[in-house]
Structures are given as C-alpha cells and as structure tokens.
UniProtKB/Swiss-Prot annotation:
One example GO MF annotation: toxin activity
Purpose of the protein: Shows cytolytic activity on many different cells by forming pore in lipid membranes. In vivo, increases heart rate or kills the animal by cardiac arrest. In addition, it binds to heparin with high affinity, interacts with Kv channel-interacting protein 1 (KCNIP1) in a calcium-independent manner, and binds to integrin alpha-V/beta-3 (ITGAV/ITGB3) with moderate affinity.
First-listed, main subcellular location of the protein, grouped into a coarse class: secreted
Subunit structure: Monomer in solution; Homodimer and oligomer in the presence of negatively charged lipids forming a pore with a size ranging between 20 and 30 Angstroms.
GO cellular component, one term: extracellular region
Subcellular location: Secreted; Target cell membrane
Family designation: Belongs to the three-finger toxin family. Short-chain subfamily. Type IA cytotoxin sub-subfamily.
Organism: Naja naja
Disulfide cysteine pairs (residue numbers): 3-21
Gene Ontology terms describing biological process: killing of cells of another organism
Tissue expression: Expressed by the venom gland.
Protein name listed in UniProt: Cytotoxin 3a
Key words, A-Z: Cardiotoxin, Cytolysis, Disulfide bond, Membrane, Secreted, Target cell membrane, Target membrane, Toxin
Length: 30
C-alpha cells in the first residue's frame, strides 16, 4: 500500500512506515 497524500488517515493505515506517510501528508498539506 502506498501513502495517500490526499487522505490524512493514510499515515495510520500505512504498514510501510508511519513517518514516511506522515511526511508525504505534511508535504501535501501546506
């Protein structure tokens, strides 16, 4: 599963790494 930058809950459901998804979300969200 890839991190969805459009969904804030993506970082919670990302098994690859919460930090990675969180960063992706933060970048997508100014």
């Amino acid at each position: 599963l890839k991190c969805n930058k459009l969904i804030p809950l993506a970082y919670k459901t990302c098994p690859a790494g919460k930090n990675l998804c969180y960063k992706m979300y933060m970048v997508a969200t100014p």
